[in-house]
Amino acid sequence: MRNKAKGFPNQVNHKFEGEPGATDAYASKRPNGETNTRPQERMRASGKR
């Protein structure tokens, strides 16, 4: 039986709710297109937010 027949909520509408995704501060590329140096520090900082 499919979700529609079971009465589950439509999950497409919930896709953009909640916390936003990664911000520019934790992006892998700089605005000029270069790759950020020290990716381990960036990933560690992203996990602590």
From Swiss-Prot:
State whether keyword Cell cycle applies.
no
Q: Where are the transmembrane segments?
A: none
Which InterPro entries does the record match to this protein? SASP_SspK
Q: What induces it?
A: Expressed only in the forespore compartment of sporulating cells.
Q: Which cysteines are joined by disulfide bonds?
A: none
One GO BP annotation here?
asexual sporulation
The annotated region (Disordered) lies at: 1-49
The entry assigns this protein to a family as follows: Belongs to the SspK family.
What is the protein name for this chain?
A: Small, acid-soluble spore protein K
The source organism is: Bacillus pumilus (strain SAFR-032)
The organism's lineage is:
Bacteria, Bacillati, Bacillota, Bacilli, Bacillales
